[in-house]
Regions:
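PLP-dependent aminotransferase-class I/II
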Residues: 99-137, 141-144, 151-158
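Conserved N-terminal alpha-helix of the aminotransferase class I/II PLP-enzyme fold
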Residues: 13-61, 83-88, 94
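Conserved PLP-anchoring active-site segment centered on the Schiff-base-forming lysine
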Residues: 71-89, 118
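Conserved C-terminal alpha-helix-loop-beta "cap" of PLP-dependent enzymes
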Residues: 75-76, 268-269, 273-342
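Active-site C-terminal subdomain of aminotransferase-like
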Residues: 135, 142, 150, 187-286
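Catalytic PLP-binding core of fold-type I/II PLP enzymes
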Residues: 151-183
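General beta-strand structural signal in soluble alpha/beta enzymes
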Residues: 3-6, 55-59, 81-82, 141, ...
Length: 344
């Protein structure tokens, strides 16, 4: 059975597997204090065009989100995100488990706009009782969004300016950052993104690595005791070089973006295949997540031969389903998907 369930259901890039194998017998210091981690950090600083950026390697996305948010915010502060934001919907209340309220606002096409944020902050500050409330201290967005959408240069610039106006830190979840940056909908590069937020992370788990995320403090200094907080949140890998080697490999010869482009090319073809067969597109995502509308009968038939996820049961007659591509997606798998659709 072919699978389009997620972008992390394969092992890892062959290049990473080879690099881990070659260095397997070496003995290095733990917790990221090794030559490979230092090399990876330097490559990331060059990639973001900021020699003063502080880089840390953590083991997974949820741990990264909770560690960054909990480290940056004071105990009485909360984090703003859209109603469909990953930390609100798909992280099991992890942020709130560490004492920070997730303050949700409506999104437009799954994105938070500067006008929505500004209106909320003006209303909040105009309330004379706001000192008795959870104080907004950070804005969280993901790039791309939960629905595969991409923030434009204009949108990101305006949002960051609004955050600065209200003294809010902007944190960008980049679990799928590579796919967002190489999509045709994106009109900026990694250095631009790094200059228009306070902290972000470069996703590895969903972009070719076995595991791991690289947190980059580009617009602010890392909070005091951030390394200690990484461990407190269960996000510090004792065999830290395993993360360093992976990111050192990903940021050698532009590999991170090469594999992201491959995934986008595969997703674009999936989009075309479904359109060719008259299947409605639910959200016009320009990235590696494609969302289509299936009837219950088509879902039942297709799911017997192809692995994918239900995103939302919209009605009795419409099921929104997600198909995801990655570095490992093959043209032959798309050929098979098209053949299956022709036979149903």
């Amino acid at each position: 059975m072919i699978s389009f369930e997620s972008d992390y259901n394969n092992g890892m890039l062959p290049e990473i597997l080879e690099a881990l194998g070659k260095t397997n017998s070496e003995k290095t210091s733990g917790y990221g204090f090794d030559p490979y981690s230092e090399s990876a950090k330097e490559k990331i600083r060059k990639a973001v065009d900021n020699e003063n950026a502080e880089v840390f390697f953590l083991i997974g996305g949820t741990q990264t989100n909770t560690t960054v948010i909990d480290s940056v915010l004071m105990g009485c502060e909360g984090v703003i995100c859209v109603e469909t934001g990953h930390i609100e919907v798909h992280e099991s209340g992890a942020v709130e488990a560490f004492g920070h309220k997730v303050i949700t606002l409506p999104g437009e096409n799954s994105k938070l706009t500067s006008s929505t944020l500004s209106a909320y902050m003006d209303t909040f500050l105009a309330d004379e009782t706001h000192p008795h409330m959870v104080q907004p201290g950070m804005v969280y967005i993901s790039m791309p969004t939960e629905f595969g959408m991409v923030y434009t240069r204009e949108e990101l610039t305006a949002l960051y300016a609004t955050c600065q106006k209200y003294n809010l830190r902007l944190f960008i979840d980049g679990a799928r950052l590579g796919y967002g940056l190489v999509s045709e909908a994106c009109d900026y590069d990694l250095p631009f993104l790094a200059k228009h937020c306070d902290v972000f992370y470069i996703g590895g788990t969903k972009v070719g690595a076995m595991m791991g995320e690289a947190v980059v403090f580009s617009g602010m200094k890392a909070p005091k005791y951030f390394f200690t907080n990484i461990k407190r949140h269960g996000a510090l890998l004792a065999k830290g070089r395993m993360l360093g080697i992976q990111f050192d490999t990903l940021f050698t010869d532009n590999l991170y973006f090469k594999i992201s482009r491959h995934a986008i090319a595969m997703a674009t073809r999936i989009h075309s295949i479904f359109q060719k067969h008259g299947i409605a597109i639910a959200y016009d995502s320009p990235t590696n997540q494609q969302f289509v509308v299936l009837s219950p009968s088509l879902y039942d038939a297709l799911s017997k031969k192809v692995a994918f996820e239900i995103w939302e049961r919209k009605s009795d007659t419409e099921i929104i389903c997600r198909f995801v591509t990655s570095w490992a997606t093959k043209e032959e798998e798309l050929d098979e998907l098209e053949h299956i659709l022709q036979t149903l």
